[in-house]
Amino acid sequence: MVNEFDKLKAGKLLLASANMLESSFKRTVLVVCEHNERGSLAFILNRPMEFKVCEAVSGFEEVEERLHMGGPVEVDTVHFLHSRGDLIDGSLEILPGIFWGGDKNELSYLLNTGVMMPSEIRFFLGYAGWSAGQLEAEFEEGAWYTAEASKDIIFSDAYERMWGRTVRSKGGEYQIVANSPELPGLN
């Protein structure tokens, strides 16, 4: 499989390779929100947490959606992706129709008044981050693949199947990878 680092940019998906054994990233699907010469930042899409936004984030008492573990960095910070950049100041478009961040007070108002629906947003605790050169080195070691992101993937609740489906969608030899057992040695 080829090194896909050159394809990486904001709005792409990072897929943990089948041989990624680090528990924080094993079989994860991440969306890249920032990628430049200083490093990269992404959020894990398929690690929902057991508690809800309303239980952990002040100002969002009406939001019954689950929080997601965005990554192992700064796990005391809250981040969000959404589809309403037209309504939330300070949003950064990472791919057409998908935005990162923005004014949390505006977001709270829009959600609490029903102008914006919880299905249009995903909340994360923490993020995945890499310093300059770190992610490139991990690509060279075969730790990651890339894939195209879409609104359907980013807001999907099919957490258990997300990694396999996304890897499989790359076609070819990736279909075999997607069907491999998590612990081949135990097979």
Curated annotation (Swiss-Prot):
What name does UniProt use for this protein? UPF0301 protein Ppha_2142
- What organism does this protein naturally occur in? Pelodictyon phaeoclathratiforme (strain DSM 5477 / BU-1)
The family database entries (InterPro entries) matched by this protein are listed as: AlgH-like
Cleaved signal peptide residues: none
SUPFAM superfamilies reported in the protein's UniProt record: VC0467-like (SSF143456)
Regarding protein family, the annotation reads: Belongs to the UPF0301 (AlgH) family.
| GO CC term (a single one) | cytosol
Question: What Pfam families does this protein map onto?
Answer: DUF179
HAMAP family, A to Z: UPF0301
